[in-house]
Amino acid sequence: MAKEKFERSKPHVNIGTIGHVDHGKTTLTAAITTILGHKGFAKAFKYDEIDKAPEEKERGITISTSHVEYETENRHYAHVDCPGHADYVKNMITGAAQMDGAILVVSAADGPMPQTREHILLASRVGVEHIVVFLNKADQVDDAELIELVEMEVRELMNEYGFPGDDAPVVVGSALKALENPEDDAATQCIMDLMAAVDEYIPTPERATDKPFLMPVEDIFTITGRGTVATGRVERGILKVGDEIEIVGLSDESKKSVITGIEMFRKLLDEAQAGDNIGALLRGVQRDEIQRGQVLAATGSVKPHKSFTGQVYVLKKEEGGRHTPFFNGYRPQFYFRTTDVTGSIALPEGVEMVMPGDHIDMKVELITRVAMDEGLRFAIREGGRTVGSGVVSEITE
């Protein structure tokens, strides 16, 4: 049979299953692929195929993740499922598996558990804005009032972490029953209802090319008689010759310039877009007025900041991280996009020290300003080796 071509006719959305261990995340993932597979929208994956997730290395951190894909009438989905709790923490903080939205799986028999809370908190910190709830194992609960109680608890928990808990769709069912009886419409209805809720409630993400232009500067050189060229990979947006941009970061003032030429693979371009590796010729900018670690950005779209709160995962010794804990006032380098900037950290009240393998909210004060938005990822480095990975959850100055 000839291989099918990947059709990009439907909008693409990245989602994932989150929730407490043994509440049925992997069973649900298997059920979704199996039931959509029966309708011709997916390749069915068995529980074991999803559960034995391959280990991946992302920024030196070992993460086990399973990726499956499937379609509904309206969309194409890439879906991630992690076997272990630590894998979720690492995945969400490093952004290894991007999620535009999530399916929170809660066992109706047990109600919200510690990791339920932790995953909701993490989702709010790393910018996952839309959560659809699946109350699983409903076949184990005889009393409808108990299910209503669990639903109320989950909605309250979501409200507590800034999600619209009262508006979030909640679907009740049994992933196992659906998986075991894919032909039985009554058993599979909960999966169809869940996917309908995901289709409707999780918005199609804005494409990278629709966002304001931004390119981290990797290198700078001078072309005699033409001016200064900054090279790098366009992170988002589109850049056209004649566009006005700002050079942001590593100083308090941003400098404006106009793009007088764009080159890619030694060919001249009229416009560059997200993903392109380019050289941009800048009008009126001297070689010493721009440096690696700054960004070129659409005017007014990004500001330089020096203090922020970050959600951080600290690498374990086995991952090449520190062998010892660190304390308040620790001063490592923070690696943003293309450069290291020294900063000092303040730990939350009541936290004396941070051990390798922990994840923690910390306040960071950098010695110089860096172009940043909430949701920007960074690495924490010490003498050139990565000891932590983080995401900016709130900018304070």
UniProtKB/Swiss-Prot annotation:
PANTHER family given in the database record: ELONGATION FACTOR TU, MITOCHONDRIAL, ELONGATION FACTOR TU-RELATED
Superkingdom in the source lineage: Bacteria
Q: Which InterPro entries match?
A: EF-Tu_GTP-bd (IPR041709), EF-Tu_GTPase (IPR050055), EFTu-like_2 (IPR004161), EFTU_2 (IPR033720), G_TR_CS (IPR031157), P-loop_NTPase (IPR027417), Small_GTP-bd (IPR005225), T_Tr_GTP-bd_dom (IPR000795)
GO molecular function terms here?
GTP binding; GTPase activity; translation elongation factor activity
* Any GO CC annotation of this UniProt entry: cytosol
The segment(s) forming the tr-type G domain are: 10-206
Quaternary state and partners of this protein?
A: Monomer.
* Residue span of region G3: 81-84
Location of this chain's protein in the cell = Cytoplasm
Q: Which residues bind Mg(2+)?
A: 26
EC number(s): the record gives: 3.6.5.3
Source organism phylogeny: Bacteria, Bacillati, Bacillota, Clostridia, Eubacteriales
Q: Which UniProt keywords apply?
A: Cytoplasm, Elongation factor, GTP-binding, Hydrolase, Magnesium, Metal-binding, Nucleotide-binding, Protein biosynthesis
Q: Hey, which family's this protein in?
A: Belongs to the TRAFAC class translation factor GTPase superfamily. Classic translation factor GTPase family. EF-Tu/EF-1A subfamily.
Catalysed transformations (reactions): GTP + H2O = GDP + phosphate + H(+)
Species: Clostridium tetani (strain Massachusetts / E88)
Q: Show the Pfam families listed in the entry.
A: GTP_EFTU, GTP_EFTU_D2, GTP_EFTU_D3
List ligand-binding residues for GTP.
Answer: 19-26, 81-85, 136-139
Region of interest (G1), residue spans = 19-26
Per the record, which residues fall in region G2?
A: 60-64
The name this protein goes by in its record:
Elongation factor Tu
Gene that specifies this protein: tufA
